[in-house]
Amino acid sequence: MNKLLIFIMLVTFLAIEKSFMSEVDNMKLEFVQTIWRHGDRSALEGLFPISEKNWTFGGGGLGELTPMGMSEMNNLGTIFRRRYVEDQQFLSHRYAAKEIYIRSTNLNRTIISAMSLLYGMFPPGAWNIQGVDYPNDVDWQQGFTFIPVHVDGIDQCAVAQLCNCRRFQELQEKWAELDEVKNATVAMIALNRRVAAFYNVTDQPEKFNRYTDAWKCQRNWFNDTMYQQLPWYNEDLYNEAQRTYAPFKRFTEGNFAKPSIVDGIDIPQEVSTLQGGPLLNEIFERGREKIRCVADAENCSIDYLKPLKFYAYSSHDQLVYALLVTLGITDVVKTVDGWPDTSSSLTIEYYSNPGNQSSVKFLYRDNSNDNFSDVTSQIPVCNGAQYCAMSDFQNIAYQFKPLPDYMTLCETSLSSISSVLNNKIWVFVIIYFLI
């Protein structure tokens, strides 16, 4: 009897496994959305021994993309081409205007990063047609074609974390009361004072914090000069600075080491809703509408989505990190400070199967890798699955959806606990009616 039961269970398991594998094998890639951090840049501020005049790259000045950054982005573009043009033949070999849309924040370094990536993704080659893709002109680089990069307007400040948000300012005051933040602040002030003394800064040395970003950028281009001019500087001090400031970057995007409730307010939930929530929901909603168009093209109400295959956003480290926080996978970042490196990217692939069921994959890459890492199974809500159900992605998005909308929420004070409860009730109502 026991042998018969075991046999039945084995046959059932194999049948389920075969059905699952068939379902996986029949998955069809329908849409790709990706966001990346710009490439290597110059420092945002001058700091001895390197001043603004030393930063001559990318047209010159502070915060500009460097040749290293251009190369990093070109490499990322080459990886995109290998995956989506050559291996999967998902995108056309030549630039097709209706297939891809590239967007950028309104800064030189992100715009040129997008251009550099596109040079790697759609490089000059025999596949481009003279007189069609580029001019029939002897002075024109053969095979080279321009690809547009669309720049954010002020109305897109929410996804770029550029809006003036009163609620977020109140949250910063609240999280300052947490022991985790207090301890990090003590360590930061101690380091600021120590480094300020090295630079002979006597005015408010506890607030001297320019060195963390400056060192990270200077060491890529002026490392020998730093060691020659700063006898106290070394790698241990550099790493200490990056690790000391790492918690404050995390706090800003809603990542706290412990449950963090202040006056009944869930600080991580509130911060992530304001910081990562707008972009996460924009990505989810665009993907959902695309899948709907795939399933029912005749009733697709958004015409541009029908042929669109690749949507990209050239942005910044904090935006990439904010998304990783909402997805629960910040551990995929392996840098010293746990912060997305230059040219790191998060990519979301949307799939359908013959039964019109949709699912997603999440891919992460930093600039030390030659390919993307599939991190889908690491996302808690995906439960270790190879493909994450679209409904699970929806649950994540709605958990961090600013309600009733971002600007209204920003103007809603934390002083009313009911505002927090109402936000959670709205999330429940939306999930109930839309799942």
Swiss-Prot record:
> For this protein, what is any one GO molecular function term?
acid phosphatase activity
Q: Which family does it belong to?
A: Belongs to the histidine acid phosphatase family.
Q: Which domain of life is it from?
A: Eukaryota
Q: Which UniProt keywords apply?
A: Disulfide bond, Hydrolase
Q: What is this protein called?
A: Putative acid phosphatase F26C11.1
The catalytic residues are H38, D317
Which parts of the chain are coiled coil? none
EC number(s) given by UniProt = 3.1.3.2
Mind telling me which PANTHER family this protein's record contains?
Answer: ACID PHOSPHATASE-RELATED, HISTIDINE ACID PHOSPHATASE-RELATED
* Catalysed reactions, semicolon-separated: a phosphate monoester + H2O = an alcohol + phosphate
What S-S linkages are listed for this chain? C382-C388
InterPro entries per the record? Acid_Pase_AS (IPR033379), His_Pase_clade-2 (IPR000560), His_PPase_superfam (IPR029033), Histidine_acid_phosphatase (IPR050645)
Q: Which organism is it from?
A: Caenorhabditis elegans
A Pfam family that this protein carries is His_Phos_2
